[in-house]
Amino acid sequence: MRVVSIGGVQVSGLCIGGNPFSGFAYQTKERGKEMTDFYTDAMIKQALRESEEAGINTFFGRTDDHIFGVLRQYWDEGGTIQWFAQVRIERDEGGEDAWRDWLQKSIDHGCVGAYIHGGVVDNWYASEKWDNFHESAELMKAGNISGGYAGHMFGAHAWIRDNLDIDFQMCSYYNPTDRSIVAHHSDEGEKWEDVDREAMFEVISSIQTPVVHYKVFAAGNRPIREGFEFMRDNMREGDIACVGMFTKDDPEMIRKNVSLFEAYVD
């Protein structure tokens, strides 16, 4: 499997994402609860161990006290997977500025990379909060980590491409919900439209930094092999992919996905 340098960090071509660990199913509320019931701390650590054994060396995961604690346990027990921190905001009043605290906590906790949450990026872009983009880019650079931005809107990634000096862009194949008013995830009215994917592919082709391809399977709402075919046709040599994996569905899922990535993409 390929290894790509992103801001000086050596990252495996396929990485494991953390949405299933935190119950973000992008399907039904019942499915989300099934994920959190299954992914106890022990099962999260097992998934990370299996990822390492399969050749995955990087975890893209949420910034919260739960994930911080699991990662600390995992590293203390000898785990070596590295962490790109998904920097978020809070739902509470005034919580829209919490990204600064979560970014610093992530750096202090040992992340090697960080990126602003895709919903936050969509919201900043729609609200024209350009100062937040520039400030966050400077803080990530000052923290001596690989820094980037996720996002579901192709327009946001085009703006980032043209206006920020960063290490990577993290491009979603789909834009399931409108985040222009509220940055937080909602499982109401999600859509998985081909037109969004094709527009993002066009922007990806013009981005100069490495791109992290994510939501490649529409969070399990589209055929898996179709997603690998899209990766094959649209990932460049210096790009990687991030995939969440719910191993309750298939205990061999991590190993199988690595094999499929190697067969289709590498």
Cite the ranges covered by each PLM segment:
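Hydrophobic faces of well-ordered beta-strands that scaffold small-molecule active sites
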Residues: V11-G18, T58-G61, I81-V87, A114-I116, ...
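Alpha-helix-loop-beta-strand connector modules within alpha/beta enzyme cores
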Residues: F38-K45, I67-R91, D131-I145, D194-V212, ...
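Active-site glycine- and acidic-residue-rich loops that bind
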Residues: R91-G95, N144-H157, E190-D194, G220-R222
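Histidine/lysine/aspartate-rich catalytic loop segments that bind and position anionic ligands
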Residues: I160-K191, E202
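Structured C-terminal cap/extension of enzyme domains
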Residues: V4-G13, R31-G32, Y39-R49, G55, ...
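Glycine-rich phosphate-binding active-site loops on the catalytic face of alpha/beta enzymes
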Residues: G118-V120, F168-R179, N234-D250
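Active-site beta->alpha loop and helix N-cap motifs at the rims of alpha/beta catalytic domains
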Residues: D37-S127
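Glycine-enriched alpha-helix->loop->beta-strand junction motifs that scaffold or abut catalytic
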Residues: G78-T80, D108-V112, K141-G143, D162-M170, ...
